[in-house]
Amino acid sequence: PAEGNIITLNVRIATPPFDRATGTWKAGVKPGIASSYIFSLKPGDKVMMSGPYGDFHILDTKREMLYIGGGAGMAPLRSHLLHLFNTLKTTDRKVTYWYGARSKNEIFYEEDFRAIEKEFPNFTFNIALSEPRPEDNWTGYVGFIHQVIHDHYLKDHEAPEDIEYYMCG
């Protein structure tokens, strides 16, 4: 508002892979405010853009992969993992995803990750809740995700320095 007609949006490209068989994106997510604005633009509308920033892609190695995400960090990590398993069909690397949320109602796409776990024995999905509610009846990991990973995975890992870490959130 203080800038007049200038609207600043921080847009990240974190889409799931394209399904060539159906010709659609594997998303199923309705557009939000930023996407709605972008899709409302008409030819000739002026926009100012900057970026992209960062370098967040899957490295072509055989090393173990450890994904660590929390909150909105789910989106780019989910995209990575769907590409890794649904497109590349990765079976030769150990892949672990540790997701942190406050309570059970903030866990997204759990079914997607459990399906990957079922199909790919080299993938494990773990969840930790930092503030589980009584009605969650939570029996899983409790605490902030970084501490849970340290205490329940990295502390006894034979070579944590050899892992590729992918973090967002």
Each predicted region: which residue ranges?
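Short, Lys/Arg- and Gly-enriched loop/turn segments at beta-strand edges
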Residues: 20, 54-62
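Ferredoxin-reductase
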Residues: 1-43, 101-103, 128-132
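A short acidic Gly-Thr/Ser loop motif
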Residues: 70-71, 169
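Histidine-anchored nucleotide/phosphate-binding helix
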Residues: 76-88
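Conserved beta-strand elements of the Class I
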Residues: 64-68, 164-166
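Reductase modules of NAD(P)H-dependent flavoproteins
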Residues: 91-169
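Short helix-loop-beta connector
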Residues: 59-64, 158-161
